[in-house]
């Protein structure tokens, strides 16, 4: 039976970074992955370009991690988004920053990121075994035994980095939650996060239209980002981010011109009162959006009476949209819920119930926005879980 100091189950970003960290600290380390290649889900992030992190400050990170982000203060004090940027830069990956602080490889290829992680694992002497599905994990005395259908390994330290349950075709089947339950850990309810929104909005009229930096709001939750109208409802970063706060049955509000106040809009209409209403709004909005807003109103701006003008402005600034639901967990980008953080040491990510057992990445009850935040959480928790901690 092969013995290692540390075994990591799951070869996504958290697992690869945990392997690098563990190997860096001199541990004989094994990474086990069920797919043929490491980073299968990572390969599809950012439209295949791999939005590897976000270059914001700590407050930005906290805002980008709505699901228990404060748990990560200790993690980020050890390894944060700027350490991620330094790591890839020092390992030969040129990075660039795009809108909203999103960081990508200059190549615009996720393989660049995955290959840099794989190369570092090899350089540090980590062992990787792919195409291997784990069937059981148990602990006897001080040793964990990890078994596949035809092999077994032992270790003193076990790190579970199997991800959540979104996009199960990439390998995120929830197996890590089964391991957690086996060791008597609590797994909180799992649901879709960063999910497109299903709505009863007139989708076909606006299908395919994308808007930059509009505002979606629900109660105190206000998200300003890009939005895409689809055949089923709303997608794009604004909708994905708001999905963390709705389930279905809520009314959300869309402001397509957040940069203008209601008074600004009233002044603009008055300034262009001789124009047709459609041509007036086309100055500010895409033609099909302008068409949508002008349908119930008179043809000319100057023909609007006061109540019609107020109604038009209110529609543009506070368009009510009924949310009927979200895409299923399997079709969402992120899993909300996971291994309860009450049972995890925030400094080491070690189990409070089982010495030597650690969790990192999306298997934990932490959910972050797209835009580099979810991968940041995975990479940083992976590094910390793999590290050696001295009291």
Swiss-Prot record:
<dbReference type="InterPro" id="IPR004792">
    <property type="entry name" value="BaiN-like"/>
</dbReference>
<dbReference type="Pfam" id="PF03486">
    <property type="entry name" value="HI0933_like"/>
</dbReference>
<feature type="binding site">
    <location>
        <position position="33"/>
    </location>
    <ligand>
        <name>FAD</name>
    </ligand>
</feature>
<dbReference type="Pfam" id="PF22780">
    <property type="entry name" value="HI0933_like_1st"/>
</dbReference>
<feature type="binding site">
    <location>
        <position position="134"/>
    </location>
    <ligand>
        <name>FAD</name>
    </ligand>
</feature>
<feature type="binding site">
    <location>
        <position position="362"/>
    </location>
    <ligand>
        <name>FAD</name>
    </ligand>
</feature>
<feature type="binding site">
    <location>
        <position position="375"/>
    </location>
    <ligand>
        <name>FAD</name>
    </ligand>
</feature>
<feature type="binding site">
    <location>
        <position position="14"/>
    </location>
    <ligand>
        <name>FAD</name>
    </ligand>
</feature>
<keyword id="KW-0560">Oxidoreductase</keyword>
<keyword id="KW-0274">FAD</keyword>
<dbReference type="InterPro" id="IPR023166">
    <property type="entry name" value="BaiN-like_dom_sf"/>
</dbReference>
<comment type="subunit">
    <text>Monomer.</text>
</comment>
<comment type="function">
    <text>Flavoprotein that probably catalyzes the condensation of two molecules of aminoacetone to yield 3,6-dimethyl-2,5-dihydropyrazine, which is subsequently oxidized to 2,5-dimethylpyrazine. It could be involved in a microbial defense mechanism related to aminoacetone catabolism through a pathway yielding dimethylpyrazine derivatives instead of methylglyoxal. It has also low aminoacetone oxidase activity, and can produce hydrogen peroxide from aminoacetone.</text>
</comment>
<protein>
    <recommendedName>
        <fullName>Aminoacetone oxidase</fullName>
        <ecNumber>1.-.-.-</ecNumber>
    </recommendedName>
</protein>
<feature type="binding site">
    <location>
        <position position="374"/>
    </location>
    <ligand>
        <name>FAD</name>
    </ligand>
</feature>
<dbReference type="InterPro" id="IPR036188">
    <property type="entry name" value="FAD/NAD-bd_sf"/>
</dbReference>
<comment type="similarity">
    <text>Belongs to the BaiN/RdsA family.</text>
</comment>
<dbReference type="InterPro" id="IPR055178">
    <property type="entry name" value="BaiN-like_dom"/>
</dbReference>
<dbReference type="GO" id="GO:0000166">
    <property type="term" value="F:nucleotide binding"/>
</dbReference>
<keyword id="KW-0285">Flavoprotein</keyword>
<keyword id="KW-0547">Nucleotide-binding</keyword>
